[in-house]
Amino acid sequence: MIKVSDAAAKQIAISVEQMGENKMPLRVAIKVNEDGSFHYNMGFDDRNLDGDKTFEEKHIPFVVDAASIALITGMTLDYVEIDGKHEIVFLNPNDPNYKAPTES
């Protein structure tokens, strides 16, 4: 399903601890825009909706809606520094705008 880098797993664990969201899974969803581009959503969510798929990666519980399952397969969450700012990024080879990361 989703791969999680060590850096992203560490940052998610920090967020869980700060927010006290110990048992809530992390919901990941993708909306395909009219132009075919992907819009990503991610947040803690304790709802269990019809068609949801749940799984665990690096001790992080995830939930994905049925429409996003095929779109997230093979995706990696990473935590990187971009222009001096740290953020979680979605590295998704299924995304039409995906560019493989390069070392700088």
Protein language model regions, located:
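Flexible, active-site-adjacent loop/turn segments at secondary-structure boundaries
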Residues: 2, 42, 69-70, 88
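Generic detector of bulky aromatic hydrophobic side chains
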Residues: 11-14, 31, 39, 63, ...
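Mid-chain, well-packed structural core segment of small domains
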Residues: 49-83
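C-terminal structural segments of small proteins and small subunits
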Residues: 71-101
